[in-house]
C-alpha cells in the first residue's frame, strides 16, 4: 500500500492553481476553518451565506429538505421555541420580523448580512442549533432501534457521500472505516485520564488518504457541502498538523479576497483551547482529525412518515458522534514509520494501562510480575497487541 501511496504523492496533481479554487466561497472557508480548529458557532457574530442555494445546501447537510413541508414546519417550530426561550427566560426582545415574519429558512441569509436584524437572527439561530441537538439526543432514547442499526445508517450515508466526492473530482486514494471493538474501548478508557465513556468520540471512525496536502482542503470543502454540519463539530477536539488554511487562501488571488473575513473570524471566535495531542502518538505523527455529531434521519430508517406521532416533539433526526481522519499520501507513509506506527501507538497505550492497573500492588505486599509485566512477555521485550 505504501509504495502505491508514495507514487500517487509524487504525481503532483491538484496544485495551488487548481481550477476548483474558483468554486470556494467564504461560507466554505469559514466552515472548513471550524472543522480543523474545533471552534464553537455560539461564539460567531455572523454567518457567511451568499444566496438561497448555499442555505439550502446547508439545510440538506442537516437532513432538512427545503422541498418538504414537514421539514420546513420543523424549522419553524424550532424558531418559535427559540424565540420563546429568549424572551421568556432571558428577557430578550427579538424583532418581530425575525421572530415571526421572515421564514425561518431565511434567517440564515439575514444572519449573513449587515444590520441590526443580523444580530437578532444570529441569537435565534444559536438557540435553534442547541434545541435541535437536544431534540436529537432525546429522540434516540425513544427509539426501538439498536446502536448497530444507527451506526450502519451512518456508514451507508458516509459511503454514499465519499463515492459522490470521488465523482466530483476529489482525489481520495484510500478510504476506510471502523468501529471501535469492545477490547479497544476498554483499553482506551483505562488509558485516559478522564475515563468517562461519554468522552470517547471515536467509536465510529472514517479515514481518508488524499494524493497531496492541498487536496485535503478540497476534501474538507466537499465534506461540509455534503455531509458534515460545521456547527456540530465538537469544540476543542480538532487536531490539524497539516493544513495551513490561511496560507492556502493567501496563495491564490481568487481566494485572497476572503482572507480579511477569515482573520476577523479568528479574532472573534478564537479556538476553544489548544488541542491536546494524543500522548501515545509518535513525536512526528501528523493528521487532520475532527469529531462531529452527524445527523441521521430515522423516519426513513423506521419506514415511518415525518408526521408520525413519534416525531411530533423532537423531529426525525438523531445525531451520532463520528470521527474523521484525513491525511495525504506522503504523510500517511511517514505516519507508519518507527515511533509513529500504529503498532508503536498500541504498545505505549497498553503499557500505560498495565502500569495504571498494577499501581499500588507493591505497597500492598503483593508480588509484582517482572517489569510489572507491562509487555505481556516474560523476557521483557516489547510485545504487540
Regions found by a protein language model. Give the residues of each.
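Short cationic amphipathic helices and targeting signals
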Residues: 202-211, 324
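Extended, gly/pro-poor, charged amphipathic helical "stalk/hinge" elements that serve as dimerization
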Residues: 154, 158, 201-202, 206
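Surface-exposed, low-hydrophobicity interaction/linker segments
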Residues: 92-125, 129-194
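An acidic, glycine-/histidine-flanked metal-binding catalytic module
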Residues: 1-92, 108-141, 157, 214-385
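Short, flexible, solvent-exposed loop/turn segments with mixed acidic/basic and small polar residues
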Residues: 190-201, 279-281, 313-315
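Charged, alpha-helix-enriched surfaces in structured cytosolic catalytic cores
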Residues: 149, 153, 195, 203, ...
Amino acid at each position: 500500500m505504501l509504495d502505491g501511496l508514495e507514487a500517487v504523492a509524487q504525481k503532483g496533481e491538484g496544485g495551488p492553481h487548481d481550477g476548483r479554487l474558483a468554486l470556494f466561497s467564504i461560507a466554505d472557508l469559514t466552515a472548513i476553518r471550524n472543522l480543523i480548529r474545533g471552534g464553537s458557532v455560539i461564539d460567531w457574530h455572523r454567518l457567511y451565506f451568499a444566496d438561497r442555494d448555499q442555505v439550502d445546501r446547508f439545510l440538506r447537510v442537516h437532513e432538512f429538505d427545503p422541498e418538504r413541508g414537514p421539514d420546513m414546519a420543523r424549522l419553524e417550530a424550532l424558531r418559535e421555541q427559540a424565540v420563546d426561550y429568549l424572551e421568556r427566560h432571558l428577557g430578550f426582545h427579538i424583532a418581530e420580523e425575525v421572530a415571526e415574519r421572515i421564514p425561518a429558512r431565511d434567517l440564515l441569509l439575514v444572519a449573513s448580512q449587515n444590520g441590526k436584524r443580523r444580530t437578532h437572527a444570529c441569537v435565534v439561530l444559536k438557540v435553534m442549533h442547541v434545541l435541535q441537538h437536544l431534540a436529537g439526543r432525546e429522540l434516540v432514547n425513544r427509539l426501538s432501534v439498536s446502536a448497530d442499526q444507527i451506526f450502519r445508517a451512518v456508514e451507508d450515508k458516509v459511503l454514499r457521500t465519499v463515492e459522490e466526492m470521488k465523482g466530483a473530482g476529489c482525489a481520495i486514494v484510500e478510504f476506510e472505516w471502523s468501529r471501535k471493538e469492545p477490547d479497544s474501548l476498554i483499553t482506551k478508557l483505562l488509558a485516559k485520564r478522564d475515563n468517562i465513556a461519554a468522552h470517547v468520540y471515536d467509536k465510529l471512525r472514517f479515514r481518508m488518504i488524499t494524493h497531496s496536502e492541498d487536496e485535503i482542503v478540497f476534501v474538507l470543502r466537499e465534506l461540509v457541502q455534503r455531509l458534515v454540519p460545521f456547527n456540530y463539530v465538537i469544540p476543542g477536539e480538532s487536531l490539524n498538523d497539516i493544513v495551513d488554511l490561511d496560507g492556502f487562501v493567501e496563495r491564490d488571488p481568487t481566494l485572497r479576497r476572503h482572507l480579511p473575513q477569515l482573520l476577523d473570524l479568528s479574532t472573534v471566535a478564537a479556538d476553544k483551547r489548544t488541542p491536546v495531542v494524543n500522548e501515545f502518538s509518535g513525536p512526528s505523527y501528523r493528521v487532520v482529525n475532527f469529531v462531529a455529531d452527524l445527523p441521521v434521519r430515522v423516519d426513513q430508517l423506521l419506514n415511518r412518515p415525518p408526521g408520525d406521532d413519534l416525531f411530533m416533539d423532537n423531529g426525525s433526526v438523531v445525531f451520532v458522534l463520528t470521527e474523521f481522519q484525513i491525511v495525504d499520501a506522503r504523510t500517511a507513509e511517514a505516519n507508519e514509520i518507527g515511533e509513529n506506527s500504529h503498532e508503536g501507538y498500541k504498545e505505549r497505550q497498553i503499557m500505560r494501562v498495565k502500569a495504571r492497573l498494577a499501581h499500588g500492588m507493591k505497597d500492598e505486599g503483593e508480588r509484582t510480575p517482572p517489569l510489572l509485566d507491562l509487555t505481556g512477555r516474560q523476557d521483557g521485550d516489547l510485545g504487540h497487541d
